[in-house]
Amino acid sequence: MSGIDIHGDEVRASGVTVKLTNTGKVLFPADNITKGELIEYYGHVAGWMLPYLRDRPIAMARFPDGIAHQRIFQKNPADYFPDWVRRVEVKKQGGTLRHVVCDKAATLVYLANQACIEFHVFLSQVGSLECPDQVVVDFDPAGPDDFDAARRCALWLRDLLTGELNLTCYVKTTGGKGLHVHLPLNRHEDFEEARGFARDAANVLVARHPSVVTTEQRKDGRGGRVYADIMRDSYAQTVVAPYSVRARPGAHVATPLHWEEAADPGLTPARFTLRTLGERLAGTPDPWAGMSRHRYDVATARRRLAGLS
């Protein structure tokens, strides 16, 4: 485990001791994956995952009885969470809501011990929550067998953003049936501006590939096409975090990719799982490692996009 020492029912991480409970509990029945194995996974990937969690309020998808049972989608910390778990107040209509910020390995392990399988993060950071540092387009195919169509849409968006607008963007599998394309921003504009750019870019794809991709929100209006979803680009909304496990049979993982990997027609979501990702990380540098070097302002991006017409 990366920077973490595990001894029986205790883990030592980030200078604190996390007591583990009921590690033999099976969370993924079809795969016989236990809570202990989930904890081991998050301990192992902490060094890769934490940079994408740090300073971001999170939402937790917890499954105390396993994925076949009720999900607890939790934003606020429970009263019993230890003091060293960071909290932050997030403004909302009529007041504030307290969120957890997972900024150290001990918190990651502690939440895994709470049967938190999925980690979902804000697209903005503490100190500037109203201004995103990323914009994301979620390519959501009509069905689980349509992943390749979503893959092609992600490549088309890369060609638009990077090839035509000279904006470096990043891609990950969602761990579900689609992919996310992220564009890093410099936090100068609010979510409305960022979402406007995402909408404009998605509309270009629809104009170029109308039989494959749509921005129609109603499922019955999509006609089997890939949905280019930009609604996550809103204040206090979340997206699944890089390297998060998904609460689905197979324990697929939301995995950052090199664009060369996304270009592989044989790519499937099942390639990256809780049990296989360790080998990948041992041999593949983090595809998103350079993201902090590429930050764009939305106004410039929109001007470049408008210049195409």
Task: Pin down the residues of each PLM region.
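C-terminal accessory nucleic-acid interaction domains of nucleic acid-metabolism proteins
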Residues: 1-32, 39-40, 54, 94, ...
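Signature for HUH/AEP ssDNA processing cores
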Residues: 100-175, 185-193, 309
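Charge-rich, low-complexity segments
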Residues: 1-112
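Short beta-strand
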Residues: 61-63, 169-175, 216-220
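Long, highly charged amphipathic alpha-helices
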Residues: 44, 152-160, 196-204
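Short secondary-structure junctions
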Residues: 51-53, 161-168, 209-210
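A short beta-strand motif that forms the metal-chelation/ATP-contact edge
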Residues: 180-186, 227-230
